[in-house]
Amino acid sequence: MENHLKKMPSPLLSLVPILVLVALLFVTIRTFGSDALSGGSQVVLLTTTAVASLLAMIFCKVKWRDIEEAICKNILGVATAIIILLLIGALSGSWMISGIVPTLIYYGMQIIHPSFFLASCCVICAVVSVMTGSSWTTIATIGIALMGIGEAQGFATGWVAGAIISGAYFGDKISPLSDTTVLASSVTHTPLFSHIRYMMLTTIPSMVITLIIFTIAGFTHTSNASGQIAEFAASLNESFNISLWLLIVPVVTGILIAKKVPSLITLFISTAMAGGLAIFFQPHLLQEVAGASVADASSLFKGLFMTFYGSTQIDTGNEALNSLVAARGMAGMMNTIWLIICAMCFGGSMTASGMLESLTSVFLRFMKRRVGMVASTVFSGLFLNIVTADQYISIILTGNMFKDIYKKKGYESRLLSRTTEDSVTVTSVLVPWNTCGMTQATILGVATLTYLPYCFFNLISPLMSITMAAIGFKIKQHHEEDQSIIVN
């Protein structure tokens, strides 16, 4: 009986919570800057949840119980993603303290040759970002070092910054440790590794084209900065016991991913293996983390668990290395988890009120073909990056807005999750007032509009997504009425 009393909100009324969200986010970003994710954005989401709920109860006759149930259902839907994020925090700490990431960086530095500096720069940042799951950490650490090397070799700052950002966001996009990757998959209800594998179809071609461009651009530069590279590598070697044996963990992790082992199991095994290697290869670092005078069993146990759950700082004598080996642990994931929960509250209120359905119905009228649907998703993601100034909010809104549309059109959720990352994750750094754009410009000392033309990976990815949609490669359409599968 209650369902008959509910009224479908008009698209205009449905826009009100979105407009309030954009306005409050604008003020929040201007006020808190890159610290907006530490609480400001979460408060904004809860505030707009209240606005959407009030409008639903007053104008649409929706009962609070229905809204509450929708919110709880949304939060329950991301419970696995939250556990994954906690494990990612533990894994990032264990990979750092065990020396896995430093070993990858150490050997990665050896491949730099002046003639191929830009391409090597992009590859190194990509590897580090894949292993850490953070473009911000990569740019703030190895990126700064590479900026110095690039400037010493006479490269324009825009080119070097473009190579660093292209590589860093390649890793941020496909790493199972990346919070944006986990967020995009959870919002669209796509299994994490299925999402990552499907992204490879657009990400790898985009990266290949990017590397070709950077390789050609680097041919004219032949100056040698081997001294600086050797100094950085030496600092890594002095702080960690660098060993190729440590690379067993990434190899095993890759095999587990290829075998489609569930994310939680893969992350747990990888974390446990890294923890064991940390005790064997880096006992001195575990002792330092524990603040103990002797590397006994108790201090090793304490140091290892502290890297799992808390923030870890290692004094290497090198400022860049200190930042690189600083792991956030599980505690470092709390802002993202908090954001996801608040976003699910907002999404639940928009769903229960019918506002999300009202907005998506407008989009549905104009999307008659697959290419138009994907292109609309891409441009919507870019638009949200511009107006919300935050990639996390943009991922959440894009996923929620188009989720039902893709389902009604019969397309797999992984197409939406891939398109969302192809548009939102990589373009956030290209917007000067976006938290990503502001942060990276500040860290690298290069204005956003200066490096924008050289972020080839970030510029190519959205276009590649649309191109793949036009070709129809590996895109399946399912029609519920006849249970048929059409491979486009």
Regions found by a protein language model. Give the residues of each.
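Alpha-helical transmembrane segments and their immediate juxtamembrane interface regions
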Residues: 11-14, 18, 123-134, 244-252, ...
